Amino acid sequence: IKVGVIGVMGIDAFYNTMASFHRTGLTIKDPTETVQYWADKIRDDVNMIIVLTHQNKTAPMQTNKESDPSVQRGFDEDYAMAGNLKGVDVIFGGHSDNGLQTPVIHPKTGTVIGLTFGQGMHLGYTKFQIDTQKYDVEFIEGFLIPVNSNELPEDKETSTLINNYRKVFPELLEVIGNVSEPLMRKYNKESTIGNLLTDYIKEAAGSDIAFLNSGAIRADFNAGDITLEQLINVYPFKDNLTTIELSGSQIKELIEYSLTLPYGIGQISGLEIKYDSLQDEMNRLIEIKINGSDLIDIKKYSVSVSGYLANGGDGYQILTKGRVLSNDKPFQDALYDEFKKVKTIQIPTLGRQINVSDLTKTSNLFSHSDF
């Protein structure tokens, strides 16, 4: 059996998950048209065509997304593509980290769509019957297999490879801090780890405000010692800490865009906000204060962000309109220095970003209880 595999990136993923300097000289064509071109080109040479996609909305960096419907991103682009392609048997989707317990079959074309929630939490199993004499692919069954990695023995070959690199770079095992309880990510809400990282960035830069996209936080901190390797796992990117001057009105626009949740909520330090997620997009902010005082529209403030965000990553174009005050220190180095200074980490409290609609839900819950 010969299987043709076509890989494709979505337009939104191209523009909003790659820093602008990485896209220099590149253009992106319509993904469906491109896949159809290559499917037609290889159709006569294979028995089956599989498309691997990197599209739909950006994945939430949260390992419990299967049990948290609020962060599940859907697979609209995969579904639309499946309905407009001819001669493609399967689409296996990525990027959104959405999951389907059983594959979906598009009623128009019969194309099978499978997604596995991402981050190695599940394996996807699909079974097909293929008639090699004539072009005929029949879907038999498909399902997800949970990966309980903590219960599995280590693969010796992989462990040896990792440990050999640790020997080459012993500094990775340096203990740079200690935390008494886990610091966990949340994609659509403020998180303890997000508050900690932005506090440290604000301190390192000496800025009024720090802002970090939730998608940049790629791991949690477990309770106990924190090593340099774990810090790199949490923030694995090689960009510079960038401080930008923005007006109060521009900061409000920044926060309003964050509250539309296109790529999760922005994690913040230096600001306290109240918002209503049930209101229209770009009209959700109710109150915003800086160090307890009202943010002034015409006043200038310093805002520290990653180099990725400073270049408009994740759609934060407002950050490209500010005046760059500094961008000469690697982001990872800034975090490392702050961890080394603090050693024993104080768990940041929550409450910087209060969604009043959540308060209303809680109030209604208790008012209707049968105590």
Indicate where each model-derived feature is located.
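Acidic, metal/ion-coordinating pockets
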Residues: 1-150, 157, 188-200, 210, ...
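Hard-cation-handling environments
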Residues: 137-141, 145-226, 232
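Generic signal for short, ordered secondary-structure residues
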Residues: 14, 21, 70, 180, ...
